[in-house]
UniProtKB/Swiss-Prot annotation:
GO biological process: one example: translation
InterPro entries: KH_dom, KH_dom-like_a/b, KH_dom_type_2, KH_sf_prok-type, Ribosomal_S3_C_sf, Ribosomal_uS3_bac-typ, Ribosomal_uS3_C, Ribosomal_uS3_CS
Function: Binds the lower part of the 30S subunit head. Binds mRNA in the 70S ribosome, positioning it for translation.
Complexes and interactors: Part of the 30S ribosomal subunit. Forms a tight complex with proteins S10 and S14.
Organism: Pelobacter propionicus (strain DSM 2379 / NBRC 103807 / OttBd1)
GO molecular function terms noted in the UniProt entry: mRNA binding; rRNA binding; structural constituent of ribosome
Source species taxonomy: Bacteria, Pseudomonadati, Thermodesulfobacteriota, Desulfuromonadia, Desulfuromonadales
Matching NCBIfam families: rpsC_bact
Gene: rpsC
KH type-2 domain: residues covered: 38-106
Any single GO CC term annotated in Swiss-Prot or TrEMBL for this entry: cytosolic small ribosomal subunit
Domain of life, per lineage: Bacteria
Annotated transmembrane regions: none
Name assigned to this protein: Small ribosomal subunit protein uS3
Length: 210
């Protein structure tokens, strides 16, 4: 059976870059765990803000965090009050100086992670999975995606037996390394159990090094 590799990891160093940009030797494991802690904290704290991606850069005792979000206003807060609170909480968590940079995601319909989370939210609101998938596919294509594939796995529609259903429109070339493919996954916590959602969005071809 053919298994699908994570399309972002597969393209690292070709057309995609790393989300953690730092170098360490002896304390590599400690910093890696710190990264995981920061990501988990931000995801939980800012779930309603539509977090697409978190990039972490380190230099000496300073940590710079780039947060890609669909709703920057919610994170910044009134006169930047919310972002200052988050900075303090992260400083307490890591005992390091934290710098936060917020970057707006202009087209959330073309961001795989945000699309996956949106489908998960709809499933939690008891919207039929086929309808939720179709709606996301249509809006992604409308905003300029060359292709999109959404997969839902679990007890769909409350069925006794879990299954996997997917829906694809356009091209999604997984083997072409120059293909700019965005990948995101989310979980919908329904009364019947967890439903996993995976989203692949093909945005066109990029020449390596550009």
């Amino acid at each position: 059976m053919g298994q699908k590799v994570n399309p972002i990891g597969f393209r690292l160093g070709v057309i995609k870059s790393w989300d953690s940009k730092w170098y360490a030797e002896a304390d590599y494991a400690k910093l890696l765990h710190e990264d995981l802690k920061i990501r988990a904290f931000l995801k939980k704290r800012l779930y309603s803000s539509g977090i697409s991606k978190i990039e972490i850069e380190r230099a000496a005792n300073k940590t710079k965090i780039n947060i890609y979000t669909a709703r920057p206003g919610l994170i910044i807060g009134k006169k930047g009050s919310e972002v200052e609170t988050i900075k303090k909480e992260l400083s307490n968590l890591t005992s390091k100086e934290i710098f936060i940079n917020i970057i707006e995601v202009r087209k959330p319909e073309l961001d795989a992670q945000l699309v996956a989370e949106n489908v998960a939210l709809q499933l939690e609101r008891r919207i039929a999975f086929r309808r939720a998938m179709k709606k996301s596919v249509t809006s992604a294509l409308k905003f300029g995606a060359k292709g999109i594939r959404i997969t839902c796995s679990g007890r769909l529609g409350g069925a006794e037996m879990s299954r996997t259903e997917w829906y694809r429109e356009g091209r999604v070339p997984l083997h072409t390394l120059r293909a700019d493919i965005d990948y995101g996954c989310a979980e919908a916590k329904t009364t019947y159990g967890l439903i996993g959602i995976k989203v692949l969005i093909f945005k066109g071809e990029v020449l390596p090094g550009h």
